[in-house]
């Protein structure tokens, strides 16, 4: 079995996913590139919300925390515990910012699709939507995760990291290699599919029935959106921890 062509085909499949389109989209032409404006606009809003809220709340820490400071400390503690559980007490520290950034961006992005008024910014085509309902965003989040667990394993074990591919037997070499190359594909599709499906269901219900009827579905969507952010962050941390511990 030839491993290299399979790995190349897997990477090519991830690249080809960037051309997937669902519904109407609004594009900007920047130089020779076509940029998905809906994703960029909502992503900038999400980043502004995260940076703005963090700056306002923690720029002047109090000995007796305010409600906002308490909330951010709770979020940080939650992310730290999640990272520690998946990576291990000795190694988790440097990875808290990475896992925290992934979790918070995905969480707020997922919720933005349901909470941000879709007509808050008028676009020539289409409407604002969650950045994570676009495959380009989820691939862009999954690829750094892949780089992170390769980096974690190599920095911890050196070239000996690649010995895991022939464990427990060399005959599993092709499968073990493909497993690592398909992880970003799995992360991308899981997040993209769930968020897109949730938004499509809400849009269909809103167009077919009165406004109050889809509200329970919207609340369910908020719950599942939070769960998807947690799953992505947990898997990212688990992959990093696995790469430093060895093959399981």
Swiss-Prot record:
One of its GO terms (cellular component) is plasma membrane. PROSITE patterns: ATPASE_A. It is a multi-pass membrane protein. InterPro entries: ATP_syn_F0_a_bact/chloroplast (IPR045082), ATP_synth_F0_asu (IPR000568), ATP_synth_F0_asu_AS (IPR023011), F0_ATP_A_sf (IPR035908). Keywords: ATP synthesis, CF(0), Chloroplast, Hydrogen ion transport, Ion transport, Membrane, Plastid, Thylakoid, Transmembrane, Transmembrane helix, Transport. The chain crosses the membrane at residues 38-58, 96-116, 135-155, 200-220, 221-241. One of its GO terms (molecular function) is proton-transporting ATP synthase activity, rotational mechanism. It comes from the Eukaryota. The keyword Cell division does not apply. It is found in: Plastid, Chloroplast thylakoid membrane. The keyword Transport applies. Key component of the proton channel; it plays a direct role in the translocation of protons across the membrane. Belongs to the ATPase A chain family. F-type ATPases have 2 components, CF(1) - the catalytic core - and CF(0) - the membrane proton channel. CF(1) has five subunits: alpha(3), beta(3), gamma(1), delta(1), epsilon(1). CF(0) has four main subunits: a, b, b' and c. This is ATP synthase subunit a, chloroplastic. It comes from Amborella trichopoda. The gene is atpI.
